[in-house]
Amino acid sequence: MEDEIELKTAPADFRFPTTNQTRHCFTRYIEFHRCTTAKGEDANECERFAKYYRALCPGEWVDKWNEQRETGTFPGPL
């Protein structure tokens, strides 16, 4: 017998109406990296932000942003 799989995504955020998911994605990515900077790479509190940005952002964007962070050219405030 197969186990049931429960799918979840980022909860609604009043700061972002449904028409602005690009900004929501970018903000969640920044929140995750700010959290890990403040609390450490293994902080459990930061995992929710990781789940949110991974659910909202296209993989190509995340790859590009990770690359930009490594080279110091990321356009956002971290």
UniProtKB/Swiss-Prot annotation:
Record keywords, A-Z: Disulfide bond, Mitochondrion
Reported function: This protein is one of the nuclear-coded polypeptide chains of cytochrome c oxidase, the terminal oxidase in mitochondrial electron transport. This protein may be one of the heme-binding subunits of the oxidase.
Protein family per UniProt: Belongs to the cytochrome c oxidase subunit 6B (TC 3.D.4.8) family.
GO CC list: mitochondrion; plasma membrane; respiratory chain complex IV
Gene transcribed to yield this protein: COX6B-3
Domain of life per record: Eukaryota
Primary location: mitochondrion
Sequence motif Cx9C motif, location on chain: 25-35
Keyword 4Fe-4S: no
Ranges for domain CHCH: 22-65
Disulfide bonds: 25-57, 35-46
Protein name: Cytochrome c oxidase subunit 6b-3
Cellular compartments annotated: Mitochondrion
Tissue specificity comment: Expressed in the whole plant.
Keyword Mitochondrion (UniProt): yes
Chain location of the short sequence motif Cx10C motif per the record: 46-57
